[in-house]
Amino acid sequence: MLLSPEQFSRLSEYAAYSRRKLKDMLSDFQQDGKFYSYLSVDGQTINIDGFRAFLIDYFGADLPSDLVDQLFLSFSKPPIKERRTSLFEDAISTVRAKFSESLSGRMAGLNIAGGSGQQTDRSQSSEPQALVCIPEDDVMGPRVANNDSQEPRIPLKPLICTLSLLEADTPENKLDVVFHVYDSDGNGFLDKSEIDGIIEQMMNVARYQQWDTIELEQVIRQMMVDIDYDNDGIVSFDEWRRGGLTNIPLLVLLGFDTEMKEDGSHVWRLRHFTKPTYCNACCSILVGWGGKQGLSCSLCKYTVHERCVRSAATNCIRTYSSRQQDKLYHHWQDANATAKCVKCKATVGVFQGKGCRWCHNYVHHRCMSALAQECDLGALVHHILPPTHIFPAFLERKTSTSLKNHNFSSHSASLLQAVSPSNDCRPLLVLVNPKSGGKQGVKILQKFEYLLNPRQVYDLSKTGPEPGLQLFSTLKNCNILVCGGDGTIGWVLESMDKMTFPHGRPPVAVLPLGTGNDLARCLRWGGGYENENLHKILEQIEKSSLIDMDRWQIKIEITENKSARRASEKGDTPPYSIINNYFSIGVDASIAHRFHVMREKFPEKFNSRMRNKLWYFELGTSETLSSSCKNLHEQIDILCDGESIDLGQDASLEGIALLNIPSIYGGSNLWGRSRKSKGRMPGLFPMKNAEKMQLQTRVQDIGDGLIELVGLESAMQMGQIKAGVRGARRLSQCSTVVIQTHKSFPMQIDGEPWMQPPCIIQITHKNQAKMLVAAAPRKRSSWMLLKRQSTNDDN
């Protein structure tokens, strides 16, 4: 069995939306479970109907039939035969075979222990054994199901283990799942055939991730032999957990996430290098043929071969101080690649100098005496929280803030306290949502962990924003960088509302990773991250300015009795109680709601910004033809600052929107540009027309305590607004809004849609959040361009 990289990627996208835990679902395969009827008599295989029902229950969505069929076929196939190899590859295979023979003596001892007295034909055979997850007859032979039908079936073990790789769980729990799944006889031990299944699973992971597997198989086999600590030929559960948690390659190859457990311990990830790089342990070059070439620490870039990881020095950075100290010294490591010397500016050859993890400077061995021992943190000193300013909370320190009034969570960050640097630095708290922007979030997380102190960088999908906010709450001067979409920003701001900041609420900058990124656009951070250099983004944060942004409280009260409501008008739960960007009812929310439903059902079709925009265009076209929200004024009443708004005046509306920022739908300005105010003769125009003219001159400001109300005529008008040729109809600018709906309407808050039954909506001002605005880009005048052109021509 082997999934293609595309199938594995599609499964990963669905897993991001799953709410179930695989470990909890294993009980459903027991005799009283809902999936038991789909199993074969021996409980080892499952039919296509059970496979489909299990996937729907696990992912919480109907997977496309083509994907289900492809997955079922992949799991039912035996291992794919290798392609015809070249002479060079044949030579390598010969070397691997000889190396395998040297290990055959130790591997022969891995068979079933005396108690059971049963062995499979495969374990007794002297022929080379195929690396499959279960015995070959279980995969290829026909199964007699509970209903005595002859139908295609797939082995259950590879399915469970493959899905376990997609879950965000602790290594301990994942190791438990793998052990119990492959312990087919349930005796608490892994015999040779069961270990072969685990090895094949690890090789599959290597193929999914397109790693270099030339020498990987022998490394894995040697590793599995070493886990058998008592050399009795079988691996117990205790040996499995002990070996799994202490052998980093095993965790990586099983697809498990490695966490930063103790200071000084490396956090490994497999990596491919674009330039010649050498192993820090054996000092030989890392060689690979297009695949991953070695294990590299995400925190300090210490790099080794897979086979050398056990001999790697435990010399990673210390992210906090276990005792009171004020000076930070360089953290030197041997230069395993070429770089420039910070002193003499000459090239530092491989292992001819050292590099500091904190200031990222390299220096020759001969130049080290001329360099100060104390580290100044280099070019990023403004953003780094030094480890000397993070220490255990129980340590008393004169410069620290009292902890008596702080309620710490159970997270490890609650055991640490941070103090502000004495200089003018503003340490940066980085909160990353790895689910935003495809794979961009994961890469940004790893890069920031290396550029800054890893204690400053948090994965929101694992910890949420609270641990990082709690650690930084005691700092006098700090900034926050949210890497994600508009929903991620709202999540962080709402978490900040629940906390106390003794020195004032820190300002927030945005690195846009979402689809619309409207808040990032109006704060000049751009419409999306385009792989810019993170050093430049940190420079922009350092030069940014402060602004206050209004935030609005929304309360929704259902007016109709739930029992009297029709089944077709069943509503959803509102996603937020606070408006940061906008709130809308009608045509635009209808398109967004249909987009949201489609994305949850087929997430693999929404994996890029361009494809998302095309889907919006298609759904907008269908909404134009259907006009599902026409005659909106007949079903909605609105009061702005106590005055009723006539929605039926002039053209009929199909939607309304309340705007807090001047960007919506990925950069559209619904309020539009304001006209210049002109004087008029008193009494020349009626009062209503005068108020309408005055409304056209009002300017939108995100910090004026006012929210703007506009009307949308149709989906076609939304396209015209997006093109910049037209604006929405201005209705009001006010500080309080009350809306009553008389039927179910699609609604959305900050891009998160839902279907809302008849209700009364109250919107009031909540507070203001401090945000960072990027500096306006410099405009090059035509004179400067002409001058530069003439200068170049002269040269």
Curated annotation (Swiss-Prot):
<dbReference type="GO" id="GO:0035556">
    <property type="term" value="P:intracellular signal transduction"/>
</dbReference>
<dbReference type="InterPro" id="IPR046349">
    <property type="entry name" value="C1-like_sf"/>
</dbReference>
<comment type="similarity">
    <text>Belongs to the eukaryotic diacylglycerol kinase family.</text>
</comment>
<dbReference type="InterPro" id="IPR000756">
    <property type="entry name" value="Diacylglycerol_kin_accessory"/>
</dbReference>
<dbReference type="InterPro" id="IPR017438">
    <property type="entry name" value="ATP-NAD_kinase_N"/>
</dbReference>
<feature type="domain" description="EF-hand 2">
    <location>
        <begin position="215"/>
        <end position="250"/>
    </location>
</feature>
<comment type="function">
    <text>Involved in AFD-neuron mediated thermotaxis. Regulates behavior to environmental temperature. Thought to have a role in olfactory adaptation by affecting diacylglycerol levels.</text>
</comment>
<feature type="binding site">
    <location>
        <position position="194"/>
    </location>
    <ligand>
        <name>Ca(2+) 1</name>
    </ligand>
</feature>
<feature type="zinc finger region" description="Phorbol-ester/DAG-type 1">
    <location>
        <begin position="265"/>
        <end position="316"/>
    </location>
</feature>
<dbReference type="InterPro" id="IPR001206">
    <property type="entry name" value="Diacylglycerol_kinase_cat_dom"/>
</dbReference>
<dbReference type="GO" id="GO:0006654">
    <property type="term" value="P:phosphatidic acid biosynthetic process"/>
</dbReference>
<dbReference type="InterPro" id="IPR018247">
    <property type="entry name" value="EF_Hand_1_Ca_BS"/>
</dbReference>
<feature type="zinc finger region" description="Phorbol-ester/DAG-type 2">
    <location>
        <begin position="329"/>
        <end position="375"/>
    </location>
</feature>
<dbReference type="GO" id="GO:0007200">
    <property type="term" value="P:phospholipase C-activating G protein-coupled receptor signaling pathway"/>
</dbReference>
<feature type="domain" description="DAGKc">
    <location>
        <begin position="423"/>
        <end position="558"/>
    </location>
</feature>
<dbReference type="InterPro" id="IPR037607">
    <property type="entry name" value="DGK"/>
</dbReference>
<keyword id="KW-0547">Nucleotide-binding</keyword>
<keyword id="KW-0677">Repeat</keyword>
<keyword id="KW-0863">Zinc-finger</keyword>
<dbReference type="GO" id="GO:0005886">
    <property type="term" value="C:plasma membrane"/>
</dbReference>
<dbReference type="Pfam" id="PF00130">
    <property type="entry name" value="C1_1"/>
</dbReference>
<dbReference type="GO" id="GO:0005524">
    <property type="term" value="F:ATP binding"/>
</dbReference>
<keyword id="KW-0106">Calcium</keyword>
<keyword id="KW-0067">ATP-binding</keyword>
<dbReference type="Pfam" id="PF13499">
    <property type="entry name" value="EF-hand_7"/>
</dbReference>
<feature type="binding site">
    <location>
        <position position="232"/>
    </location>
    <ligand>
        <name>Ca(2+) 2</name>
    </ligand>
</feature>
<dbReference type="InterPro" id="IPR002219">
    <property type="entry name" value="PE/DAG-bd"/>
</dbReference>
<dbReference type="InterPro" id="IPR038199">
    <property type="entry name" value="DGK_typeI_N_sf"/>
</dbReference>
<dbReference type="GO" id="GO:0042048">
    <property type="term" value="P:olfactory behavior"/>
</dbReference>
<feature type="domain" description="EF-hand 1">
    <location>
        <begin position="170"/>
        <end position="205"/>
    </location>
</feature>
<feature type="binding site">
    <location>
        <position position="187"/>
    </location>
    <ligand>
        <name>Ca(2+) 1</name>
    </ligand>
</feature>
<dbReference type="InterPro" id="IPR029477">
    <property type="entry name" value="DAG_kinase_typeI_N"/>
</dbReference>
<dbReference type="InterPro" id="IPR011992">
    <property type="entry name" value="EF-hand-dom_pair"/>
</dbReference>
<feature type="binding site">
    <location>
        <position position="228"/>
    </location>
    <ligand>
        <name>Ca(2+) 2</name>
    </ligand>
</feature>
<dbReference type="InterPro" id="IPR016064">
    <property type="entry name" value="NAD/diacylglycerol_kinase_sf"/>
</dbReference>
<feature type="binding site">
    <location>
        <position position="239"/>
    </location>
    <ligand>
        <name>Ca(2+) 2</name>
    </ligand>
</feature>
<dbReference type="Pfam" id="PF00609">
    <property type="entry name" value="DAGK_acc"/>
</dbReference>
<dbReference type="GO" id="GO:0008270">
    <property type="term" value="F:zinc ion binding"/>
</dbReference>
<protein>
    <recommendedName>
        <fullName>Probable diacylglycerol kinase 3</fullName>
        <ecNumber>2.7.1.107</ecNumber>
    </recommendedName>
</protein>
<keyword id="KW-0479">Metal-binding</keyword>
<dbReference type="GO" id="GO:0005509">
    <property type="term" value="F:calcium ion binding"/>
</dbReference>
<dbReference type="GO" id="GO:0043052">
    <property type="term" value="P:thermotaxis"/>
</dbReference>
